[in-house]
Amino acid sequence: SFSILKDATATALYGTRGANGVMIITTKSGKDLDKPIINFRLEGALTSLTKVPEMADGVTYMEAYNEGAARPTSAATPYSREKIEGTRAGLNPYLYPNVDWYDEMFKKNAFAQRANFNIRGGNKKMDYFMSVGVKHSDGNLNSLSEKYGFSYNNNINVTNYDFINNLNVQATPTTKLSLGLNASIKDWKGPNASTSSLFASTMEHNPVDYPVSFPAGYGYDTEDIMWGDKSGGPFATGGYMNPVADYVTGYKTNHTSIITANFKLQQDLGMFIKGLTFNGLFSYKNHSSSNATRVSDYNAFEVASQNDETGEYTLRRTGNERGTAIKTSGSHSGNRKLYLQATLDYKHTFGGVHDVNAMFLFNRQQYNTNNVTDLFSSLPERKQGIAGRVSYAYDGRYMAEANFGYNGSENFASGNRYGFFPSIAVGYNISNEKFWDNIRPVISNLKLRGSWGLVGNDNTGAGRFTYLEDIDLGGSPGYTTGVGGNRVTYKGPKWSRFFNPNLGWEIGEKINVGIDLQLYNSFNLTVEAFKETRRDIFLSRGSTIPDFLGLSGATVYANLGKMKNIGMDLSIDYNKQVNKDLFLSFKGTFTYAHNTILERDEPPFQEYPNLSSVGHSLGQYLLYIDNGLFPDEKTIHNNPDQKALGYTPQPGDIWYHNLPNYRGEYDNVIDGNDRRYVGNPQDPEIVYGFGPSIKFKKWDFSFFFQGVAKTSILMSGIHPFGEARIRGLFKYIADDHWTTENQNIDAKYPRLTLENNGNNTQNSTYWLRNGSFLKLKNAEVGYTFKGWRFYLSGQNLLTFSPFDYWDPEMGSGSGMKYPTQRIINFGIQVTFNNK
């Protein structure tokens, strides 16, 4: 089971780990049963990629390229009509390639299997839960290495083994011992290049410049594969990176194991003080990972000359000749985590109406890495703290609670090392009042609650012992002495991180107010409003440090930021047993959260206030404001100069808005000062979900929708032709861009050009899109018969969004990240128990 804690009173006992909320995961335990419950599940799954950006075919690509080459400023050689028509006709694929790189490398569906066996049982003295699971899956890549003559199959092949063992023993009437032993083992095999980079590579390469490979011969006596390529690219020895060759010429293996042991002791101390209990926890976690990589270089070729009439051609090598022997390398990593916790709990009811609870907690955690590379990594990383809680409830109606946490961190100097974080909460359960008796059949429960508290965060994001200085003894500062050939340069020390003994805790003040309502014993509604002010946020100093201090290149960390976050959470839960055959339930959640930057490391005065992020949300975009596309030369001439963006604009280029300085003056020049923060943040401000569950006789059906709103996507890295790599052409660009024949100033893409058009590649509102979406996240139908359950389920089945270029859940960028997966599961579950 999963539960999430967010307010300060709920997270106080977790110390620094609870600064940004806590997720509690509880695994199953045993139970006092006459007979054990045995459960077996077998499942298969089909996986596919949800939405892949559609690329233009070879003919469309070349015609678009020639359109860009026709600009007056272009010196590029356009594709010949013979090549275009030969490609259209599907002639010799080595002279007229039309490669769909995505189809070459990726398949439509992949398959996964999963099996799980668990047993649960026990008696009053001992209970147990044991689970064994195995999962095997392959990826959506095609198996190509054997096709090209390699002895290995480097397609993704992943096997996971999971073991859970929980044992509880009632050693004495007052002593309970619990032991949990969990293991997770993962064996991974796949290509040397990451799946994400391979996917991006299929998008980045155009379909027409070279085939996947050439047949053997053509003047070269070699048994190696003659991979297709084009000279002049960024590959280290000349040419480009052939996506298929990059995929098949290597593989790597990874073995990861995570072993966790938890030992708990619960001792009733009622023989000394009634209601007093001691709880102890010892937890040890070991993580180990080993990697082996085997990879070879490859030789690539391009067409040197060709005879269109006969179809004959000659080849030449791109770059230097490379050896193709497989080279092997490996590495090992791991870490160990130790956690100790001791608590004293007191619970007692006085006079039948006064409930008093108290707890005192001590915890300590230690982290060690198995890969010691420097002084810091050789030292154990430790945190420790104490916490306490006192709560009182009168007759189940009036409730009050007070907490404190006192935590220490190695990231701060001795004077700031420990922080004190108190919190309080009150509640009023109106429905337990006597005057509520007549209302209770309708309003079953009504509770008002509120809390205030402080939380502390020590995660600076800058490594360990952040307050200490870090000096590079071989840095760039130094001096040169001697003359002529006797000149010698000596390097000197430099600060890479400046010391700050005043660095302290990042502190969040949290206020929560909520209401819990239940109607007719079946409809539950929870509404909670929250506000958090986070101060002393860790930031590195930038433009506020003058150069004359001599700290150029050194990072200076300090408590510089302040932010406010307000919002609300709403949840609905409805459960109704309509009759003996029909059960209905519905769940819905809604969260709204809006943050505002109050302070950060910025100059106290700016000539252009629009460049300040203060008053805006974290994750908003600093963008040029577009006015659409320039319709003609006259408009360009009559508007502010945009040459400072690195390109002289022409009709069809993006037209930007000039912004004034703090005096309201316009400089009639478009440059970096003409940007401001616009749009919604990258992280959505609204997240919601809803879905029903229905059980009718032996059938069950459920589905769940999940959506986000008030979020923006900024498109970037999508521009064809003018990049350093052979950029592919997205179909939506080919379908809707500005042309001299169709001068649509509202086109989705400006005019095509082969140059690096700095005017059109600026981050601007022209590329800003609404990132909202609603997804059918899960759906399942099942049938149960005498302990057997058959089911069919799916994940990421449907997506509704105004943004349709790629899966909006992937966020900003070019859509070249590995997409989310659609999964169809089909399985069987059988349970044997004591019924």
Residue positions per predicted region:
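Short Pro/Gly-enriched beta-strand edge/turn motifs at strand-loop
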Residues: 95-102, 372, 671-674, 761
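Conserved SET/PR-domain catalytic core that frames the SAM/AdoMet-binding pocket
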Residues: 587, 597, 674, 684-697, ...
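Extracellular/periplasmic, surface-exposed regions of secreted and cell-surface proteins
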Residues: 109, 166-175, 180-185, 211-212, ...
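Extracytoplasmic gating/loop element in the C-terminal half of outer-membrane beta-barrel translocons
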Residues: 73-79, 239-245, 308, 708-789, ...
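Conserved small-residue
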Residues: 39-92, 193-198, 464, 575-682
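A generic structural motif
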Residues: 136-138, 408-410, 576, 682-684, ...
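Membrane-proximal, glycine/serine-rich, low-complexity loop/turn segments characteristic
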Residues: 1-3, 9-256, 264-266, 459-480, ...
